[in-house]
UniProtKB/Swiss-Prot annotation:
GO-annotated molecular function: aspartate-tRNA ligase activity; aspartate-tRNA(Asn) ligase activity; ATP binding; nucleic acid binding
GO biological process, one term: aspartyl-tRNA aminoacylation
Protein's UniProt name: Aspartate--tRNA(Asp/Asn) ligase
Known partners and oligomeric status: Homodimer.
Coiled-coil boundaries: none
Gene expressing this chain: aspS
Lineage, opening ranks: Bacteria, Bacillati, Cyanobacteriota, Cyanophyceae, Acaryochloridales
Annotated stretches, region: Disordered: 580-605
Length: 605
């Protein structure tokens, strides 16, 4: 019977006999004495097999190799002072093995080194193909433990401190409009009809409020068939919450307490309260994004009023057509960023055009205070306009001013992208800093140019500000996002709880009465039976853990993630299925299914 985990043995255990199980992380033979680093999920401990002191265990120690599974029985000893390893939690002790039992061996060449001492860079495709081995590695095991501790902290706060109850909502539900693409599941017993996997528990958690649940939470699995990137997965996990009889201030206050509890429990960080707040409009004006990273400055400056009558038509024309001109002021940028990078073919020009800009104008403030720019700008701005630009932006000698001119959304996207690029290049981001803030007062709707209609900026169940009820199309939403170092980690709102108002919102986004009844009739009917005021929030667990772990991708914080092509390299999913299965489901494929078999990666050298 195991007495200890490997990483838990300490000086207090010196003189006792312990029984450990684990994997051989590393084996070393020093002058006939064999040293074994034994690893389990808790960490590593050093095992010593000395033929003079423990002759019975020595033959087994000789045959050990990396990743053999073993049982070790031995006596805990204090290490000599010159062999203490401060890098290990168990570095003050070692265990002299009285007995070693090999429980399993490795029958194939390892595709990559597991031991952290090897410090081997492994291609992600290989890691995902052999994910069960990747999860043995220290960094990945640490991420899984961190994820567990975050969820544990969430549960304890919500249940013990805030009176929430956990309720599971259905995985098989119905497809509804106004979201990403659904994953669909055909019904065998109802031919021609389909379930959808939930993109969120939104409607069910609102129904739980109608049911009198009052305070609900769930660690919910959600599914969205959308294009993937570094922090997106087709299936993901969120902390889902809903509360009755609470206004926005009460919800934000409770959630700040929750986040502070998580950070203190998991990272030992005391967060100051209350969290800063920005309105959506202020965030867009100052940073060009509704999820600004406030660990550094580089705020945008609107200079449209200064340049609306300028002779430079790129500026004045953009403003005349309803657009804006903004500046990204970069201290010390004049000497550090060359013209080559700003002009066509340069990396900053490419960043700007990728975001939709047609070009990238600039002004340099030389060390002598003189302005340097292209002739078309220098010749078409008055001395007063030049002086006002320098005053408005606070430009000093050495500043570089990058301009965005055009449609507001494009300008914001361009300068936000450049702001992030410059911050990384100039090392302006403190990786140890923790900046959290709320973004509030989002618009209820945004214009979808492709479909030529208004659509809900968040979702159509978000309640408008009471003072904006006179014109819902321009109303602000009672919505809020939590931003952590430039990443949205949570978002929520107060909900509509009156059926008449809900129907008005549906109508604005193009859902007529017949469609509303077909898709959401059950919700509208529930609202007829005394629905309490309610609101909620959902946190992206995968993304939150990624940021807490300092990982580059949420794939590093999920046990078995999909690739950016929505494939599981370990199991080969998605895969073709037998024709009989499709027949039973009354599904006819549009074309023959292609094989999804992948070439097995070669073991690493």
């Amino acid at each position: 019977m195991r007495t200890h985990y490997c990483g838990d043995v300490r000086l207090r255990d010196v003189g006792t006999t312990v029984t450990l199980y684990g994997w051989v992380d590393r084996r070393r033979d020093h002058g006939g004495v064999i040293f074994i680093d034994l690893r389990d999920r808790s960490g590593i401990v050093q095992i010593v097999s000395d033929p003079q002191r423990t002759p019975d265990a020595y033959p087994q120690a000789e045959r050990l190799r990396s990743e053999y599974v073993v049982k070790v029985v031995g006596r805990v000893s204090k290490r000599p002072a010159d062999s203490v390893n401060p890098k290990l939690a168990t570095g003050d002790i070692e265990i002299y093995a009285d007995g070693i039992e090999v429980l399993n061996t490795v029958r194939q060449q390892l595709p990559f080194a597991i031991s952290s001492t090897e410090n081997e860079e492994v291609r992600e495709e290989v890691r995902l193909r052999y994910r069960y081995l990747d999860l043995r590695r220290e960094r990945m095991a640490r991420n899984l433990r961190l994820r567990h501790r975050v969820v544990q902290a969430m549960r304890r706060f919500l249940e013990d401190e805030a009176g929430f109850i956990e309720v599971e909502t259905p995985i098989l539900t119905r497809s509804t409009p106004e979201g990403a693409r659904d994953y669909l599941v055909p019904s065998r017993v109802n031919p021609g009809e389909w379930f959808a996997l939930p993109q969120s528990p939104q409607l069910f958690k609102q129904l739980l409020m109608v049911a009198g649940c009052d305070r609900y939470y769930q660690i919910a699995h959600c599914f969205r068939d959308e294009d993937l990137r570094a922090d997106r997965q087709p299936e993901f996990t969120q902390l889902d919450m809903e509360m009755s009889f609470m206004d926005q201030e009460e919800i934000l206050d409770l959630n700040e307490a929750l986040i502070c509890h998580i950070f203190k429990t998991v990272k030992g960080i005391e967060l100051p309260r209350p969290f800063p707040r920005l309105s959506y409009q202020e965030a867009m004006d100052r940073y060009g994004t509704d999820k600004p990273d406030t660990r550094y400055g580089l705020e945008l400056v609107d200079v449209s009023d200064i340049l609306k009558d300028s002779g430079f038509k790129v500026f004045s024309g953009a403003i005349a057509q309803g657009g804006v001109v903004k500046i990204l002021p970069i201290p010390n940028g004049s000497d550090r960023i060359s013209n080559v990078r700003i002009k066509p073919g340069g990396d900053l020009f490419q960043e700007a055009t990728t975001a939709g800009a047609k070009g990238l104008a600039y002004i340099r403030v030389r060390n002598n205070g003189e302005i340097d720019t292209i002739g078309a700008i220098k010749d078409n701005l008055s001395p007063e306009q030049k002086a006002l630009l320098l005053e408005r932006t606070g430009a000093q000698p050495g500043h570089l001013l990058l301009f965005g001119a055009g449609e507001t959304a494009t300008v914001n996207k361009t300068l936000d992208r450049l702001r992030q690029t410059i911050a990384r290049e100039f090392n302006l981001i403190d990786p140890t800093a923790t900046h959290l803030l709320w973004v509030v007062d989002f618009p209820m709707f945004e214009w979808n140019a492709e479909e030529k209609r208004l659509e809900a900026l968040h979702h159509p169940f978000t309640a408008p500000h009471p003072e904006d009820l006179g014109d819902l199309k321009t109303a602000r939403a009672q919505a809020y996002d939590l931003i952590f170092n430039g990443h949205e980690v949570g978002g929520g709102s107060l909900r509509i709880h009156q059926p008449e108002l809900q129907r008005q919102v549906f109508e604005i986004i193009g859902i007529d009465e017949a469609t509303a009844q077909e898709k959401f009739g059950f919700l509208l009917e529930a609202f007829e039976f005394g629905t309490p005021p309610h609101g909620g929030i959902a946190y992206g667990l995968d993304r939150l853990v990624m940021l807490l772990a300092g990982a580059d991708s949420i794939r590093d914080t999920i046990a078995f993630p999909k690739t950016q092509q929505a494939r599981c390299l370990l199991t080969g999913a998605p895969s073709s299925v037998e024709p009989q299965q499709l027949k039973e489901l009354h599904v006819t494929p549009a074309k023959p299914a292609k094989t999804t078999a992948k070439t097995k990666p070669r073991p690493a050298d």
